[in-house]
Amino acid sequence: MTASGSDLIRLIERARHEEPGALDRLLDSYRNYLRLLARTGLDASLQGKADPSDLVQDALLKASLRFGQFRGSNDAELAGWLRQILARCLADFIRRYRTGIRRAGREQSLDRLLDRSSEAMGRVLAASGPSPSSSAARRDLGVVLSDALAQLSDDYREVIVLHHLEGLDWDEVGKRMGRSAGAVRMLWTRALKQLRPLIDERL
């Protein structure tokens, strides 16, 4: 079950005090979130050249080594800090395949892209049902959504990611999934119905 915002604040403090295992538990709780962002941060031409899990592992390793530089105190600040690290990892990966783009500009562009992807996760929550209460929202909803999506079947997760996070219309989603537009829309409806209780149990 996804930790609450208050649990995360305590875990951040334990990690700062170098309690054994605390930093690993803390960073691992963002793994699904970062994996989803890594996928949306790679365009179609690069998705076959990189495993998002490898990019996330690289980002989490860097975060572990640099945790002393983190100055935030809550879940949202840590999620933002990790997005910045992931953006740099993505920029480094892209640099190996593409040249002529200034690195600093690429990192800023990717950082904005990941921020937009994180915001798009909120729209998935809105589509799946009523918004959570303000007390529940203390936990970063992008992290909650990512953990819930990880529990769905591959097809259910894929249709939500393609439509909401990659912004594809139903015809494009259908082509990617080898189904008709009508079929993927029905699949999406069932996926959202299954997603909502998975979100609720994490809030």
Question: What is the predicted function of each stretch?
Answer:
Residues 13-17, 40-47, 58-75, 96-98:
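Sigma70-family region 2
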Residues 34, 84, 115, 119-161, ...:
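Amphipathic alpha-helical segment used for protein-protein interaction
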